[in-house]
């Protein structure tokens, strides 16, 4: 590694808080868009028999139920992962024991 790349690598540790916040917000937006895409694809395949000019009541009810179950399942998984993370010791703490 030459001196210019080592100095730029050292500068990476001091990230601008505004830039970091912007990246976090954009990452959340990307995750949300991916979730919407997955949900749309899944529910479309499940609920749409024959696309027509108007959504019939059966398809509408199916879409509503599908979206609600998708959200419930996603929330359950996130909560479960959060519980799992809380119950595991932090890596650095486990090394000091």
Curated annotation (Swiss-Prot):
- Tell me the function of this protein: Mitochondrial intermembrane chaperone that participates in the import and insertion of some multi-pass transmembrane proteins into the mitochondrial inner membrane. Also required for the transfer of beta-barrel precursors from the TOM complex to the sorting and assembly machinery (SAM complex) of the outer membrane. Acts as a chaperone-like protein that protects the hydrophobic precursors from aggregation and guide them through the mitochondrial intermembrane space.
Record's keyword annotation contains Transferase: no
Protein's organism: Homo sapiens
Query: Domain comment text?
Result: The twin CX3C motif contains 4 conserved Cys residues that form 2 disulfide bonds in the mitochondrial intermembrane space. However, during the transit of TIMM8A from cytoplasm into mitochondrion, the Cys residues probably coordinate zinc, thereby preventing folding and allowing its transfer across mitochondrial outer membrane.
Q: What is the effect of changing residue 66 to W?
A: In MTS; disrupts the assembly of the heterohexamer with TIMM13
Q: Give the similarity note.
A: Belongs to the small Tim family.
What's a single GO MF annotation on this record? Answer: identical protein binding
TM region positions: none
What is said about its interaction partners and assembly? Heterohexamer; composed of 3 copies of TIMM8A and 3 copies of TIMM13, named soluble 70 kDa complex. Associates with the TIM22 complex, whose core is composed of TIMM22.
Which residues does the record list as Phosphoserine (modified residue)? 57, 87, 94, 96
Where it sits in the cell: the answer is:
Mitochondrion inner membrane
User: Which Gene Ontology cellular component annotation is one that this UniProt entry carries?
Assistant: mitochondrion
Tissue-level expression:
Highly expressed in fetal and adult brain, followed by fetal lung, liver and kidney. Also expressed in heart, placenta, lung, liver, kidney, pancreas, skeletal muscle and heart.
Its placement in the membrane is given as: Peripheral membrane protein
Which parts of the sequence form the motif Twin CX3C motif?
43-66
Which keywords, in A-to-Z order, does the entry hold?
Answer: Chaperone, Deafness, Disease variant, Disulfide bond, Dystonia, Membrane, Metal-binding, Mitochondrion, Mitochondrion inner membrane, Phosphoprotein, Protein transport, Translocation, Transport, Zinc
Matching entries from Pfam families are given as: zf-Tim10_DDP
User: Which disease?
Assistant: Mohr-Tranebjaerg syndrome: An X-linked recessive disorder characterized by postlingual sensorineural deafness with onset in early childhood, dystonia, spasticity, dysphagia, mental deterioration, paranoia and cortical blindness.
Recorded protein name is Mitochondrial import inner membrane translocase subunit Tim8 A
The GO biological-process annotations, alphabetized, read as:
nervous system development; protein insertion into mitochondrial inner membrane
